Design a protein with these regions (language model features):
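Catalytic cores of nucleotide-sugar-dependent glycosyltransferases that transfer UDP/GDP/TDP-activated
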Residues: 1-591
Length: 591
């Protein structure tokens, strides 16, 4: 072959080589773009499912066919009739009892006439009478949070979850909240301003308030908006201001003034944390003889760490007697005797005190050394009740979860494998990985996180691991469904409720580090321990991560039995948590 031909052939080969390289680069680029597009489509699918669920929830609310929503709205209309002097307190009380009657289908009768004016609606109410009252309790929450309207911590989930569970069991529940500027009003159905002001005492004078009413998840909600002290709740944050005592004592006093003005006679006034604890002494010293003789007070503490200590003279702002209350057996702080303790007021003046904790017993809470209320809790120990939080089983159920590529249940676990594959693909994990582990921390700072991570890295070195430090609602469902093991900072998780949801979705909850794992030993099996704490102690508390992994790999029958058993347990709001509260309501009504 001639040199020219060789040179030409070499040029052709080099050209073909460059073209092949370009084709390979192009194909790689197309593959990357295709993968990115696939990931984008998957993210959009999850987002779309979330949006569909929101639209369906909104549609359900807007149809106004839910019996709880209609009953709640009807109660709020009755309140408005009292405030505008259309009816008296006695007749309003009779109407409320009528709504609580289990033998009457309020929703069916009134669903088509709720649009009528108050005068027309009153005529229908007066015709709709003569029935007997059912045995349920009428509970009014005076609180500072309620999901999803205003949510900062565990209180919001608790108020909504417990209220819905109580209504499903035949009790009548209402909520009173401040009208914050930051309210999520899109979640409030039928929001309306009541065309009447009511006045409340504060700082030596009567001040006007505007009332707004609406329905959230079938629960009647009243929002109190101060007119003169309008800056109290027009701020960016809910808590954390130097005048928080003034803000929430005003709201507490206004709530009681409103209850009396509207002619309400609830069985239980349910107050929460220190922010509404001042309701206790206000009720017994000022309001009990204003038509509320049959009402009792329940306090729930999400935590004993936040208490609010103030100068005694500030009690006079809402109409209390500082001299009479600044005593060791009343509001005087146990450590700073020159101050009063607002949370202590709630403990002393409530008929029952619910302390929310998944794992601790009453004795352990009383003997704790961090909150300073030990003497007070010891004196009032017969009032104390410990209740574990629940979770929303309708939103967190793998058998109907719309976020999952395939549903599954304890009776049929096939769908969990499909969820695992989907999660592996979403996070770029190897599809042949048999175990997926997650640390689901949420968006805030978690105490002890660095120590926990160090422990985890020492115990498990695996590239098929992902740490999710930011909470994503849609991804959370897929994480639970696709995981075999969920690493939890604590079993006392009242915000994200990871241990509860993990068991529901067939993932084993394991404590993150050895220090937390040892804490399981303090869950003594006395009569005060909850069913949840006993179950967790027996099945999960003392299992290290290495043992869980070994059991999953080498003893699948034992693993499957334990997982399926956990999935069948009911730790929702409707179960143990609700039952404990109903028992507490019954106990204080018999006092």
């Amino acid at each position: 072959m001639r040199s020219g031909e060789l040179e030409e052939k070499g040029t052709d080969i080099w050209k073909l080589f460059r073209e092949a390289q370009q084709n390979i680069l192009y194909l790689n680029k197309q593959r990357i773009m295709a993968k990115e597009e696939l990931d984008r489509v998957k993210r959009e699918k999850i987002s779309l499912l979330d949006r569909i669920e929101q639209l369906e929830r909104t549609k359900l609310i807007n149809t106004r066919k839910d019996k709880f929503s209609i009953s709640a709205e009807l109660l709020l209309r009755i309140d408005a009739m009292v405030l505008t002097s259309l009816i008296g307190s006695k007749e309003a009380s009779e109407f409320r009892r009528l709504i609580m009657d289990s033998n009457v289908s309020i929703a069916d009768y009134f669903s088509e006439i709720m649009h009528k004016q108050d005068t027309e609606l009153l005529v229908e109410l007066r015709h709709f009478s003569g029935k007997s009252r059912k045995s349920g309790y009428h509970v009014i929450h005076v609180c500072t949070e309620m999901a999803p309207v205003v949510s900062v911590g565990s209180l919001a989930l608790y108020v909504t979850g417990l209220s819905r569970a109580l209504q499903r069991k035949g009790h009548l529940v209402e909520v009173i909240l401040p009208k914050y500027a930051s309210l999520n009003l899109n979640e409030v159905h039928g929001l309306r301003e009541v065309d009447a002001e009511f006045h409340s005492y504060f700082n030596g004078q009567l001040h006007g308030n505007r009332i707004w009413t609406g329905v959230v998840y079938g629960i009647g909600v009243t929002f109190i908006e101060p007119l003169y002290y309008s800056s109290f709740f027009s701020r960016e944050n809910i808590y954390g201001y130097s005048n928080d005592f003034e803000r929430f004592s005003y709201f507490s006093r206004a709530s009681l003034d409103y209850i009396v003005k509207a002619g309400k006679q609830p069985d239980v006034l349910h107050i929460h944390n220190w922010e509404t604890s001042i309701v206790g002494p206000l009720f017994w010293d000022v309001f009990v003889n204003q038509g509320l003789e049959g009402t009792r007070i329940m306090l729930t503490c999400q935590s004993l760490e936040s208490q609010c200590v103030e100068q005694p003279e500030k009690l006079a702002l809402c109409g209390l007697d500082p001299h009479g209350l600044h005593r060791s057996d009343r509001l005087q702080d146990n450590h700073k005797s020159h101050l009063v303790n607002v949370l202590k007021a709630g403990v002393v003046y409530s008929n029952k005190v619910i302390i929310m904790s998944s794992m601790q017993t009453k004795g352990q809470i009383i003997n704790a050394t961090i909150h300073g209320l030990e003497p007070t809790l010891t004196i009032h120990k017969d009032k104390l009740v410990v209740a574990p939080p629940g979770f929303d089983s309708s939103a967190w159920d793998p058998s109907v979860d719309k976020f999952l590529p395939q549903n599954y249940s304890a009776d049929n676990m096939k769908g969990k494998s499909a969820c695992k594959v989907s999660l592996q693909q979403h996070l770029g994990l190897q599809e042949q990985a048999s175990i997926i582990l997650f640390v689901f921390m949420g968006s805030g700072q978690t105490p002890g996180l660095n120590t926990a991570m160090e422990y985890f890295e020492e115990e498990l070195k695996d590239e098929n691991t992902r740490f999710l430090n930011k909470y994503d609602e849609a991804l959370a469902h897929l994480v639970l469904a696709g995981s075999d093991i969920m690493l939890c900072p604590s079993f006392d998780d009242t915000v994200l409720q990871v241990p509860l949801k993990a068991m529901r979705y067939g993932a084993m909850p394991i404590l993150l580090n050895s220090t937390d794992r040892k804490s399981g030993h303090f869950v003594d099996r006395d009569l005060e321990g909850s069913k949840f704490s006993g179950y967790v102690k027996d099945n999960f508390t003392n299992i290290p991560l290495s043992q869980a992994i070994d059991e999953l790999k080498n003893n699948p029958s034992k693993w499957d039995k334990k997982i399926v058993d956990a999935m069948t347990k009911d730790f929702s709001w409707d179960a143990e948590c609700c039952d404990i509260h109903i028992s507490a309501y019954a106990a204080i009504k018999n006092l």
